[in-house]
Amino acid sequence: MTTDVIADMLTRIRNANQRYLKTVSVPSSKVKLEIARILKEEGFISDFTVEGDVKKTINIELKYQGKTRVIQGLKKISKPGLRVYAQANEIPQVLNGLGISIVSTSQGIMTGKKARLANAGGEVLAFIW
């Protein structure tokens, strides 16, 4: 049993991406579904589906451009031992706008750019580039 389910999801995606796998399965939760939705909206993954009745899993289809990975890196920022919070004007940019930050706000989980536009701060979950 893992204590940080978001880090587990990011690690599974990173490992599958390094092996050039087409799909990766992740145990489902509301937070993970929101992160997968953001990754699809931003073009980092092709698609995702939810399967199963009792134990639902999210099947994420990774995206490649020829032999090049679309996801170059993933980094978990806020950890169970050290939570990282940022106000709306302090949400960091990733690689000068080439990547995204995922932020958990009072209005839901969204990208750092949308959080800045909504003037909502929160917990910085991850960086993806």
Curated annotation (Swiss-Prot):
GO CC, alphabetical: ribonucleoprotein complex; ribosome
Record-linked InterPro entries: Ribosomal_uS8, Ribosomal_uS8_CS, Ribosomal_uS8_sf
Source species, domain of life: Bacteria
GO biological process: translation
Protein name according to UniProt: Small ribosomal subunit protein uS8
Quaternary structure note: Part of the 30S ribosomal subunit. Contacts proteins S5 and S12.
Family label: Belongs to the universal ribosomal protein uS8 family.
Gene Ontology MF annotations: rRNA binding; structural constituent of ribosome
Transmembrane segments: none
Protein purpose: One of the primary rRNA binding proteins, it binds directly to 16S rRNA central domain where it helps coordinate assembly of the platform of the 30S subunit.
UniProt KW keywords: Ribonucleoprotein, Ribosomal protein, RNA-binding, rRNA-binding
Taxonomic placement: Bacteria, Bacillati, Mycoplasmatota, Mollicutes, Mycoplasmataceae
PANTHER family reported in the protein's UniProt record: 40S RIBOSOMAL PROTEIN S15A
